[in-house]
Amino acid sequence: MAKFRLSLVQFLVSPVKSENLNRACKLIKEAAQKGAQIVALPECFNSPYGTKYFPEYAEKIPGESTERLSQVAKECGIYLIGGSIPEEDSGKLYNTCAVFGPDGTLLVKHRKIHLFDIDVPGKIRFQESETLSPGDSFSVFETPYCKVGVGICYDIRFAELAQLYSKKGCQLLVYPGAFNMTTGPAHWELLQRARALDNQVYVATASPARDEKASYVAWGHSTIVSPWGEVIAKAGSEETVISADIDLEYLAEIREQIPIRRQRRHDLYSVEEKKN
């Protein structure tokens, strides 16, 4: 199939987990009814984002949140990229994205590889590593349309991850994320366009809607970028669902017009996956 419909759900996360799950499922169903074949949720969609919240809201996988996602994916017959949730496993906490197929099967579980530890004096300091552990594996899943690579938020800053996903044959990269009011306006769109252009792939980012009263205020602006580096769909800060057609023939045309994949000097440099 040369084209498919991708939708990103940007919704206002509340402190009540059950409300978040109900709201997410409602918006997923609305997106599916409008023709979405792949739907993505935001980072930390079932809880407020913050190191003090991760232990309180953490779940096993499978657990309450992922069971709901599995059910709604099956009900709608879609591929569902389940944003991320705080996951507890063997005494450790992870920032984890679970992906489900149209039959409700768990296809892949991506644990955020690069933890969000930054300190911008006078603006923002955040240390995910205070409570979270990093993941150590790559996450690619197959669809009838194309291969899809998954990262979470801060993972997008690392060009190597996108390059490895591209080498694995991914034509769409999806990053549930929650940039803030400092890094959001400066880097959010720039990073997406860079990853799309560097690798000649579609890039999508799903953010929570902005809540000015939250302890961590998300930038919002969920976005879909083409392999030409063009923004083809973009939200504001409010709760919404955005959609775009992912056109794989267009992607192939771009790769033929500017054939950087054939022109790379593999005799001089490479980005390689390290095996454990």
UniProtKB/Swiss-Prot annotation:
Its EC number is 3.5.1.3. The active site is at residues 43, 112, 153. Its main location: cytoplasm. CDD domains: nit. It catalyses: 2-oxoglutaramate + H2O = 2-oxoglutarate + NH4(+); 2-oxosuccinamate + H2O = oxaloacetate + NH4(+). One of its GO terms (molecular function) is omega-amidase activity. Residues 4-248 form the CN hydrolase domain. It is found in: Cytoplasm. Transmembrane segments: none annotated. Belongs to the carbon-nitrogen hydrolase superfamily. NIT1/NIT2 family. Homodimer. This is Omega-amidase NIT2. It comes from Xenopus tropicalis.
